[in-house]
């Protein structure tokens, strides 16, 4: 598949760099399961889907859950024992402060 070829080319060009692949369904995950990647981003999946993906991955690489995760459903994702969890809610409503330091 195209994603397999892409991963293999990236690995050849940058053997020391981490490769992180985003997948949004189990079929996509199965396509890359035998590839050498460091992290798979499981995007917009339910906790049940994340748990199923973790069974398929079986420790081959780290997995990060992201998308539609918020402070209300965070515990459900944490219970899956996924390696990483991203919560966009933390940064979506942030107001930045622009300041400078003059010496």
Task: Specify the residue positions occupied by each region the protein language model found.
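Short, flexible coil/linker segments at or flanking structured domains
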Residues: 7-9, 17, 62, 73, ...
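Catalytic cores of alpha/beta
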Residues: 27-38, 45-59, 69-87
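Glycine-rich tight-turn/loop motif centered on a GG-T
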Residues: 15, 38-39, 60, 99-103
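Short secondary-structure transition/capping segments
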Residues: 65-73, 93-95
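Short beta-strand/loop segments at the ligand-binding rim of alpha/beta enzyme cores
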Residues: 12-20, 53-68
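General beta-strand structural signal in soluble alpha/beta enzymes
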Residues: 21, 42, 65, 86-87
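Glycine- and Gly-Pro-enriched alpha-helical subdomains that act as flexible
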Residues: 1-49
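Flexible C-terminal active-site loop/helix
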Residues: 77-103
């Amino acid at each position: 598949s195209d994603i397999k070829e892409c991963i293999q080319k990236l690995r050849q060009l940058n053997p020391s760099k981490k490769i992180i692949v985003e997948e949004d369904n189990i079929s996509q995950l199965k396509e890359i399961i035998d590839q050498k990647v460091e992290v798979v981003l499981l995007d917009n999946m339910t906790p049940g889907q994340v748990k199923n993906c973790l069974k398929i991955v079986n420790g081959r690489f780290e997995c990060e859950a992201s998308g539609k995760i918020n402070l209300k459903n965070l515990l459900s994702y944490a219970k899956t024992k996924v390696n990483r969890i991203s919560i966009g809610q933390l940064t979506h409503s942030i107001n930045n402060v622009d300041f400078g330091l003059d010496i």
